[in-house]
Amino acid sequence: MSKVIGIDLGTTNSCVAVYERGESKVIPNKEGKNTTPSVVAFTDKGEVLVGDSAKRQAVTNPEKTIYSIKRIMGLMINEDAAKEAKTRLPYHITERNGACAIEIAGKIYTPQEISAKVLMKLKEDAEAFLGESVVDAVITVPAYFNDAQRKATKEAGTIAGLNVLRIINEPTSAALAYGLDKKDSEKIVVYDLGGGTFDVTVLETGDNVVEVLATGGNAFLGGDDFDNKLIDFLANEFKDETGIDLKNDVMALQRLKEAAENAKKELSSANETEINLPFITADASGPKHLVKKLTRAKFEGMIDSLVAETITKINEVVSDAGLKKDEIKEVVMVGGSTRVPLVQEEVKKTFNKDLNKSVNPDEVVAIGAAIQGAVIKGDVKDVLLLDVTPLSLGIETLGGVMTKIIEKGTTIPTKKEQVFSTAEDNQSAVTINVLQGEREFSRDNKSLGNFNLEGIPPAPRGMPQIEVTFDIDANGILTVSAKDKATGKAQEIKITGSSGLSEEEINNMVKDAELHKEEDKKRKEAVDVRNAADSLAHQVEKSLSELGEKVATADKENIQKALDDLRETLKNQNASKEEIESKMKALSEVSHKLAENMYKKDEPNTANDKKKKDDDVIDAEVE
């Protein structure tokens, strides 16, 4: 087996590493640098430039220079993040089959194709360095990338001619690089703030085990957003002074982006910098220049709300791990944006301890990916990497309830099954609506996709057994299947997620679950009691019909009255849980004789057979 390379495919920069002779090391590119800009450019001569050469000509070729492509990877064109990208990026974002794509000189490219060009360069640089062909790779993604984004990343690798052995989470990869040589068990936090994404992960490392305890983040927050705050400030100031909106000029916008990025870097070591952009534009009165002094304090005022979001997420994730901050031994800083002083100050203040800067924030993720590649190949033995799923997964059941099948924080890969049944008599098909989130009701969670299982033989409600299986592989990609146990008919869907989770959706999922915990509980209890009442009424009606004349007239009248009372109460959508339970109790009492007659009618072993058959059936029904 040839060498396995580890790749950190970043929003701003990418890095490749390899494990050989007992250590993981970064592979420099042909230009002699350890990182390669994730930039692709198409020239008028038909050339395709990748990396530094593409970045250098961005100002003169803004509409054909593609950067930050990771921000639209796996997104649909109608998503908020895609709409935001269209206003920020100078190149033409369009759509292909509803998904984001790029149009350059009349040709459509998918984000996978653009990313593949970056991966191809990394592959070629690795082959030149190692002196041999490279095919196998481990590629990292943000922990909060959804299934569509993970799948798109894997597809980019395939397009680049790579056999992607594994997709692993960036903070987990960093922890693998940091914690491999740790003999004593310790709990650490990896704070990963890159160019376009943010993750925070709590892990336990030691004795060659790296276990994720909790993870969280925002797939649309990073250094690009810091730059955008500064771009907005500069453009608005210039407009106030001259009346000219630089955002309408793609070349000026590209110059602003470069200036903002450089100012951000300079303010990491200096208290003040000057942004000087001569001949940024012109009007009837002549050329215009943009000259602006910027202090670190001013810049920090622009980005403090973004940094505060990351601190809030830290608190949530540490809490999810069941830990207190003083139990965290180390805080490892990963990603180029962690060089911003305000970020370091706020994280340090949060944990009240010095930050661990022993790892290179631009290289550690690729180094960890190379280690994981060596583990898969067998060069590194006895190393165990235990990652988790960040949100619960389940399906919609009767009453619009979300029934969880895989709980948040479950170690992956994992496979779990539950058996459900039908909600109506003679129901020939069920719709499986796959959900992600922490709320009790389907409408409050994220729908990842749905599919139908058809051809179920006619049978009374509750009789068919539909086995639903959730299977998450080591790449975090979900496959859901449903099988009718009687006929063996099956249907499955690989969840590719038509859209990513927006910042608002992700933050609100867990927060809303906590805020509405009591409200959700009451609503779920009300749905449960209605389902139970409906089931009882159905069973009593069925028994009355089967027994016919065996039931005394007086008993039948009493049962029918109680049954009608319950049905009437259920028609009232405002009926309380207590009212329904009262009517259920009345029906249960008067139908006691009916139950006795049914019992006498059954053969002795029937009840035991029924119980055995139903042991694995969950008390929930699929609509």
From Swiss-Prot:
Chain positions found as Phosphothreonine: T197
Induction comment from the UniProt entry of this chain: By stress conditions e.g. heat shock.
GO terms of molecular function: ATP binding; ATP-dependent protein folding chaperone; unfolded protein binding
Superkingdom assignment: Bacteria
Swiss-Prot/TrEMBL keywords: ATP-binding, Chaperone, Nucleotide-binding, Phosphoprotein, Stress response
Residue ranges, annotated region (Disordered): 595-623
Gene3D superfamilies with a match to the protein in the record: 1.20.1270.10, 3.30.420.40, Actin, Chain A, domain 4, Substrate Binding Domain Of DNAk, Chain A, domain 1
Family matches, as Pfam families: HSP70
Keyword Nucleus: no
Chain intervals with Basic and acidic residues compositional bias: 595-615
The protein's role, per its UniProt record: Acts as a chaperone.
Family: Belongs to the heat shock protein 70 family.
UniProt name for this protein: Chaperone protein DnaK
Native source species: Campylobacter jejuni subsp. doylei (strain ATCC BAA-1458 / RM4099 / 269.97)
Encoding gene per record: dnaK
